[in-house]
UniProtKB/Swiss-Prot annotation:
Similarity comment: Belongs to the LSB5 family.
Keyword Cytoplasm: yes
Protein name: LAS seventeen-binding protein 5
GO biological process entries: actin cortical patch localization; actin cytoskeleton organization; actin filament organization; endocytosis
Organism: Saccharomyces cerevisiae (strain ATCC 204508 / S288c) (Baker's yeast)
Parts of the chain that traverse the membrane: none
PANTHER family, A to Z: LAS SEVENTEEN-BINDING PROTEIN 5
Predominant localisation class: cytoplasm
Signal peptide: none
Record function comment: Essential for the organization of the actin cytoskeleton, fluid phase endocytosis and vesicle trafficking, together with YSC84.
Region entry Disordered, spans: 160-184, 296-354
């Protein structure tokens, strides 16, 4: 703790800052030691203070961090929640929730005063909806630990649903999503050890020892997401379009995002124990996404309408139409990685790459 600091700054903050700032650390591996740090003091007061410190560290990296730090901080928070860790104080921290809400709805700028990157906005919104689904699926709506996250998810989902209905009534494109045109998530694995030549020529490299836990988790999430989407479609009333059902649509968005991660690992994993499982996971996701498309509303609009831009008040990318993204941590290397903006505001368009 600094001499003039009003807030504690212990190993908890140092650990969070370290593991979200570099891809050299596998979050799934670092999670357990971090949980132990937060739970180290069994005294109720210290336990509360530790959670407050963790929430503050997460918020700082979301607010002031570069894109890598923001992305990995969201991933770390998702791991806490998805693994069933009940940190009541951390999950209900008002400032953290406000920052997440502002990011997910694109209503607040980063600490530098600039707009958040579209990919970060999409990621935060997708996580907020997935946390809401996790809470409802496990009947945790009345659990005090998740009350803040539940309200956050509802807010994001309502904003998305409102913009989606507005597009349908205002002539936005409907019909099939063309999800098979989705590209792999090229932000999922970009090792800091890659040379400029590696980045320029897109040479696939992966450290299986570090990535194995993450691959297992993604395979598990992919299969669970496919089943969840299929189940939501089975429960649709006869004659109701999948695109008109909020639950089915949110599960479709999740499944599509996870499939992009699976596709990325299929580019990197060419042999070994995970290859067959990744192929199977992709097949299951494709089947579920296709089933959603088969139940979607069709219209007579031309294919070109899928390429239109939308102003939905949530994902305003007009100011973010960059042809490439330069990471503030390593601008020379990151400038070699192209950035292609997408239109999350139209979850059924060709350019939607969650």
């Amino acid at each position: 703790m600094g001499f003039l600091s009003d807030h504690p700054h212990t190993a908890i903050t140092e650990t969070i800052f370290r593991i979200v700032s570099s891809r050299d650390y596998t979050l799934e591996v670092e999670l357990a030691p971090l949980i132990q740090l937060i739970k180290a003091d069994h005294n109720d007061y210290n336990y509360t203070v530790n959670q407050e410190e963790a929430a503050r560290a997460l918020r700082k990296k979301i607010k002031y961090g570069n894109r890598l730090q923001q992305s990995r901080t969201l991933d770390l928070l998702d791991l806490f929640i998805s693994q069933g860790v009940k940190f009541t104080v951390m999950y209900n921290d008002d400032k953290l929730l406000q920052r997440l809400r502002g990011m997910a709805t694109n209503s607040e700028n980063s600490g530098s005063g600039e707009k958040y990157e579209p990919r970060i906005i999409k990621k935060c919104a997708a996580y907020a909806i997935s946390w809401l689904n996790y809470i409802t699926q496990n009947n945790l709506e009345n659990a005090r630990a998740y009350s803040g996250l539940y309200q956050l998810g509802q807010t994001v989902k309502q904003r998305y649903s409102k913009s989606s209905r507005s597009r349908r009534s205002g002539g936005g494109s409907g019909g099939r999503s063309n999800f098979m045109d989705d590209s792999a998530d090229d932000t999922l694995y970009q090792s800091n050890s890659l040379t400029s030549a590696d980045r320029l020529y897109r040479i696939p490299q992966i450290n299986m020892n570090k990535e194995a836990p993450r691959i297992r988790l993604i395979i598990s999430d992919a299969l669970a997401s496919a089943v969840s989407l299929q189940n939501s479609l089975i429960g649709l009333p006869k004659g109701k379009f999948s695109t008109d059902d909020e639950e089915a649509t949110s599960k479709f968005i999740q499944a599509r995002a996870i499939r992009r991660k699976v596709l990325r690992y299929l580019q990197l994993v060419t042999e070994g124990e995970f290859l067959g499982s990744l192929i199977h996971a992709n097949d299951e996701l494709v089947a579920a996404l296709t089933a959603y498309d088969d139940r979607s509303a069709q219209d007579d609009s031309s294919d070109e309408s899928d390429h239109g831009s939308y102003d939905d008040g949530i994902y305003d990318e007009n100011e973010q139409d960059n042809s490439r993204y330069i990471d503030s941590e390593s601008s020379e290397e990151e400038s070699l990685s192209s950035y292609q903006p997408s239109t999350i505001s139209n979850p059924f368009g060709d350019h939607n790459k969650i």
